[in-house]
């Protein structure tokens, strides 16, 4: 696999060092900035405005995972060093056996760091690479302002992709990329710390392809490109919809490069394998590093988590349960989305064949 092993090893080492560095940042200002807007960001019940849009927004917002991310950013145990924090990812919660992140974050802020009535949890099986930007941002801005900033970044990236695609005379790439966004509940992605990660990575990957496709293709560097995209997804994403960072760039590749059907099929398989090696390899690297250095038991925990998540869904076999969930998701979209679906299927398929 050429340079894959070296790229993975370097990525794991650099990723670990960067996490250690951000855990050296002072958390006091971060906590104060979170306290300023925690009430606005975690509204419940009568606190939610009465208008229909606000109700839709607050009903569907990913506050559960957003609250975990924010609290991970402001946690600091006085008897633990930066490396231990980066590997263990300590997290206080009001409950011992279940997670209540929204209530726990509110309590954490209101108690001014008094955690006597809270339970210490760990979340070691993920990299939590989002802390590389979330911690510095919370050092400077409130939680609400960070969300607005991410919203602006996403809009700017979408405009950049659109302009670049038009200039490169590849409007189909823009159509596939931005059209896909309609399937992601766009408003909710735009205002969610959790759900925006994979979308931002996807936009950056597509933009890089538009700018450097000729070089990547001529030098045969697309396998490494998809490897790196998989690595970045594994590092930054909090297990939301990671496959998007593979699927959309793949569609864009076949719009940018025409070849015989058999060659395209081989490339499809090869690029998927590259992305998968990057994604799984980077994730496994976290387990190995944490287990070897701190005996965290992360590998055992991860294996049991995988087993638990491949069991039946609602009494259905895993495969049938998966299709059932997809069906429920499709009910969330209006009828006109069928037109967008047809466009997304025909454009890449025509290029592939």
Model-based region annotation:
Residues 222-249, 267-280:
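Membrane-interface alpha helices of multi-pass inner-membrane proteins
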Residues 46-123:
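Interfacial juxtamembrane loops and adjacent helix segments
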Residues 268-341:
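Membrane-lumen/periplasm interface segments of specific transmembrane helices
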């Amino acid at each position: 696999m050429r340079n894959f092993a070296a790229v993975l090893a370097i990525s794991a080492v650099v990723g670990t060092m960067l996490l250690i560095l951000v855990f050296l940042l002072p958390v006091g200002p971060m906590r104060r900035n979170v306290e300023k807007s925690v009430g606005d960001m975690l509204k419940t019940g009568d606190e939610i405005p009465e208008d229909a849009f606000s109700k839709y927004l607050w009903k569907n917002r990913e506050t559960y995972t957003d609250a975990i991310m924010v609290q991970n950013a402001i946690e600091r145990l006085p008897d633990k060093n930066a490396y231990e924090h980066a590997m263990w990812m300590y997290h206080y919660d009001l409950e011992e056996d279940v997670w209540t992140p929204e209530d726990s974050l509110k309590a954490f802020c209101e108690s001014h760091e008094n955690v006597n009535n809270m339970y210490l949890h760990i979340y070691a099986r993920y990299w939590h690479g989002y802390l590389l930007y979330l911690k510095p941002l919370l050092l400077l801005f409130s939680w609400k302002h960070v969300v607005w900033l991410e919203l602006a970044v996403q809009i700017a990236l979408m405009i950049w992709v659109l302009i670049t695609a038009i200039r490169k005379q590849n409007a189909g790439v823009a159509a596939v990329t931005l059209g896909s966004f309609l399937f992601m509940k766009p408003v909710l992605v735009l205002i969610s710390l959790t759900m925006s990660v994979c979308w931002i990575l996807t936009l950056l990957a597509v933009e890089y392809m538009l700018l450097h496709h000729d070089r990547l293709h001529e030098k045969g560097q697309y396998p490494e490109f998809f490897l790196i995209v998989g690595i970045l997804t594994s590092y930054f994403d909090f297990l939301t919809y990671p496959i998007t960072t593979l699927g959309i760039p793949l569609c864009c590749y076949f719009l940018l490069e025409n070849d015989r059907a058999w060659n395209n099929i081989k490339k499809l398989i090869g690029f998927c394998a590259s992305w998968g090696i990057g994604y799984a390899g980077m994730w496994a690297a976290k387990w190995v590093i944490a287990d070897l250095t701190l005996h965290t038991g992360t590998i055992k925990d991860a294996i049991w988590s995988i087993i638990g998540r491949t069991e039946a869904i609602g009494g259905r076999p895993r495969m049938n349960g998966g299709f059932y969930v997809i069906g429920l998701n499709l009910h969330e979209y209006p009828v006109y989305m069928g037109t967008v679906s047809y466009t997304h299927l025909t454009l890449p398929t025509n290029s592939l064949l």
